[in-house]
């Protein structure tokens, strides 16, 4: 019998540390015999990676940003995410639609009703026999105060167009994530990212065991 596919997203502001934990989760799943696809947004396909480069480096308004993001997302869903789920794989994605509502919606102040329309159009018609919107099964939200995140990023490397935004922008983004989590508490799991990496890793593995993603008998290290 084919195992259930899982679509798990990792969300948080720049500097929250989410990306550093994705490979550890992938390794834990592979030890249990699961096939894992690790991907990211913006990006995940050749077309979407090209759009990512434009998004991070070229000036554009909030509507253009949103259209670019959702164009890449549609290609990513059709080419990578939906087929992997049909095969029963676990998809681990570094950011997804919640980031669009947080960055373009809350951060840029773009109309969230328009984002919701784009979400419905882009993420539907991907599952056989239904026009339902495809959402993650679980979203891991790495919650960190914007001031702390900014201090972590300072001097790390040349910032992209988003990382270079003032801390007030990231306060709005962080609130956008909090609003999304409050609206869908069954899907979101919050992690306190203002802790040492191993403590965050322990939180993460406990959540994955509790949600049934990982075998509860497996060690989380």
UniProtKB/Swiss-Prot annotation:
Pfam families: Thymidylate_kin (PF02223). InterPro entries: P-loop_NTPase, Thymidylate_kin-like_dom, Thymidylate_kinase. ATP binds at residues 12-19. It is an enzyme of class 2 (transferase). Phosphorylation of dTMP to form dTDP in both de novo and salvage pathways of dTTP synthesis. Belongs to the thymidylate kinase family. This is Thymidylate kinase.
């Amino acid at each position: 019998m084919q195992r259930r596919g899982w679509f798990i997203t990792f969300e948080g502001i720049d500097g929250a540390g989410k990306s550093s934990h994705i490979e550890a989760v992938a390794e834990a799943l592979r030890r249990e015999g699961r096939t894992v696809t690790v991907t990211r947004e913006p990006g995940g396909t050749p077309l979407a990676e090209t759009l990512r480069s434009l998004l991070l480096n070229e000036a554009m308004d909030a509507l253009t940003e949103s259209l670019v993001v959702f164009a890449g997302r549609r290609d990513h869903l059709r080419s990578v995410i939906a087929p992997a789920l049909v095969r029963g794989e676990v998809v681990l994605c570094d950011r997804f639609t919640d980031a669009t509502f947080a960055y373009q919606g809350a951060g840029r102040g773009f109309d969230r009703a328009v984002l919701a329309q784009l979400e419905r159009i882009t993420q539907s018609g991907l599952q056989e026999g239904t026009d339902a919107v495809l959402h993650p099964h679980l979203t891991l939200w790495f919650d960190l105060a914007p001031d702390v995140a900014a201090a972590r990023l300072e001097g790390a490397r040349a910032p992209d167009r988003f990382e270079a935004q003032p801390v007030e922008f990231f306060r709005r983004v962080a609130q956008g994530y909090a609003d999304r989590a409050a609206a869908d508490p069954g899907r979101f799991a919050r992690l306190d990212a203002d802790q040492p990496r191993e403590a965050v890793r322990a939180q993460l593995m406990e959540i994955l065991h509790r949600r049934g993603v990982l075998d509860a008998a497996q060690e989380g290290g």
